[in-house]
Amino acid sequence: MAGSRRRIRLALLFGGRSTEHAISCISASGVLRALDRDVYDVVPVGIDTHGRWVVLPDDPTALAVTGDRLPAVVAAHGESVVLAADPTTPGLLPCRPRGGLDSVRNTLGSSDALGSSDIPGDIDVVFPLLHGPFGEDGTVQGLLEMAGLPYVGSGVFASAAAMDKQHMKALLRAAGLPVGSYAVLRAGDTLTGADQERLGLPVFVKPARGGSSIGISRVEAWADLDTAIKAARASDPKVLVESAIVGREIECGVLGILDGPGAEASVPAEITVTSSAGFYDFEAKYMSDATHFDVPANLSHAVREEVRGAAIAAFEALDCAGLARVDMFVTADDHVIINEVNTMPGFTPTSMFPRMWEASGVTYPQLVDRLVRLALRDGAGLR
């Protein structure tokens, strides 16, 4: 229509090579439903577990959980593409099965078809809805900066620092923020007797660069430590052993302010786990009803504001951008201890980040739109 505004072409990246592949797909299903097609020309780009990029149909139902089946990106269901790291060329290029590049068209076709002649090359903004290594850890963020594409979320440094729990905790502690006691085990390392005495029991053993509680074990006896370390190393050769903190599990969302600098915090939420695992593991998060959520959390005004302030302080200490979810503990004497910072929190229907913002007056579609607008405002280049 003459005079109509061109839609914003948004590439939604999901899937990926990490163990959180399925969670990313479920998150993408929710975001696809939330995006206004009158505003956005959406290009769903799935990354399979081998790292192949494919343009897929714009179908949220294909990425939803069906019974006990988790979704996955299947390369055969779409058209293979690569992202050009040269900012002078279109963002997405058709790719032959053996890796050769087709010629790039001068005139781009519709994104509704999946033929190689219709792959939309030019991209205005990217939403890298990827969780875990090879997606949330600064790798894809660096690629997007090389390609000259604006993208949702934190930059290379913040993404990498938040993904690696060792460095995240070190940076938070250096900023004067409270974190729990921990030890780092690299390949071949074992926990020393001095560390055992310092940490005490129980402890949590987890991959240093994992998420969605995959590979995490609660250890009640030192005799079980080696088994837990082996389980964590299935995801990451570097492992963290953390002192268990007795307290309420509290989460708080942080979101960039669109019409000015800085960020704001959502109302906090509380997680109570009733499963036999006794902690917020993968099954409790995504596959069962063994978790109770209070949104907002029942906290005193003073503690609530301390939690919100700590969330923003952690966000700023890591130099985050766009969004983050900060996980904390509140002890019986109302001390706030920061556990983790997630720079690309889940967007599944049960995820806490959108639920906390919904309780704060920001609807799911408004949340997604604001994140994209923040990315467009900040533009391409270094964060």
Swiss-Prot record:
Residues the record lists as binding Mg(2+) 2: 340, 342
Pathways per UniProt: Cell wall biogenesis; peptidoglycan biosynthesis
Which residues are noted in the entry as Mg(2+) 1-binding? 327, 340
Extract the Pfam families matched here: Dala_Dala_lig_C, Dala_Dala_lig_N
One GO cellular component term, please give it: cytosol
Q: Which superkingdom does the taxonomy of this entry point to?
A: Bacteria
> Which cysteine-cysteine pairs are annotated as disulfide bonds in the entry?
none
Q: Catalyses which reaction? A: 2 D-alanine + ATP = D-alanyl-D-alanine + ADP + phosphate + H(+)
Subcellular location, record wording:
Cytoplasm
Tell me the cofactors it needs.
Answer: Mg(2+); Mn(2+)
Molecular function (GO) terms for this protein are:
ATP binding; D-alanine-D-alanine ligase activity; metal ion binding
Q: Which GO terms describe its biological process?
A: cell wall organization; peptidoglycan biosynthetic process; regulation of cell shape
Q: Which UniProt keywords apply?
A: ATP-binding, Cell shape, Cell wall biogenesis/degradation, Cytoplasm, Ligase, Magnesium, Manganese, Metal-binding, Nucleotide-binding, Peptidoglycan synthesis
Report the residue ranges that make up the ATP-grasp domain in this protein.
169-373
Extract the PROSITE patterns matched here: ATP_GRASP (PS50975), DALA_DALA_LIGASE_1 (PS00843), DALA_DALA_LIGASE_2 (PS00844)
The residues that hold ATP are 196-251
| Enzyme Commission number(s) of this protein | 6.3.2.4
Cofactor-binding details, from the entry: Binds 2 magnesium or manganese ions per subunit.
Protein family membership: Belongs to the D-alanine--D-alanine ligase family.
What is the purpose of this protein? Cell wall formation.
Q: What is this protein called?
A: D-alanine--D-alanine ligase
Species: Frankia casuarinae (strain DSM 45818 / CECT 9043 / HFP020203 / CcI3)
